[in-house]
């Protein structure tokens, strides 16, 4: 909710590639999700947290033309920030403050690397080497550089800070519900999950309305980030407008944000340089950017598998499983998914794209159809004493 204010503060400040960020300002580190080569630094400056995403440029010898997915990801951040976040269309996308192409990635990596030597492969096999995932990533990148498989230039992007990703938050919510008074907490759990799903589905709907050829292509729970705010009063609300409907959410609470656009596309607007080749195989892999069910299917099936994993790990009995089934059935045809799950678990889990696969397409709706249905009616009543403090996607914008 404070993105616009922070954008005005950071956007015009130049980035000093040699001295930024100050090592003392780095509070935590992580690596990109889903096998990404990116690294992420959480920095605190003037009591404001933000994420610094470091995007190396790797060389792929088998390609005549090097894929530009990482450069396209930055363009998506910039596009969505300008088109949707700063204009109050939606706050549910991770915004970018600024970015810069810097030189000499080796010096940068050595500056932020812990004072440890990188282990050899033999040492990894024969010794109990205590290295974090972040440290391993740095060592791998340095190795790429030594073997001339990484350019000296890299992208440094300053992004909006979020507290954690949806996969972790979902697990924390489940722990709280099932280990601390199930009966009293299950309703609140489903309310919070409904809020998150509304925010993401609303955002997908307005983007797809504007750009029918948009597809995120990697919309799993690890790529949804979560921020939580409690600075507003209980009677302060935010309003969301879609077609003839208005939805009201308490200003306090969860704000889910779509992140990671490395495989995203808007046909004829933002396309990677490999899309011309991808089109030749899209039919084989059931991939179609104009299929508006694909992204929401990925998100819902990932939640389904997260629930399944938790149920198995904690050996939940039927009385505690049924509420989950009833909730998920509002969004996805659980009977059909369960049937496929029992017949071919691995095929279901490995199916990312569903264009032309009618048995999967029929289990869900498009984002537009979810919004126009009654599944989010809990957010359509505004309390009598409520005060609306922000309007998103208002027809007056």
Curated annotation (Swiss-Prot):
Its EC number is 2.7.11.1. ATP binds at residues 31-39, 53. GO terms for cellular component: virion component. The keyword Cell division does not apply. The active site is at residue 218. SUPFAM superfamilies: Protein kinase-like (PK-like). It comes from the Viruses. Residues 25-397 form the Protein kinase domain. Belongs to the protein kinase superfamily. Ser/Thr protein kinase family. This is Putative serine/threonine-protein kinase R301. It comes from Acanthamoeba polyphaga mimivirus.
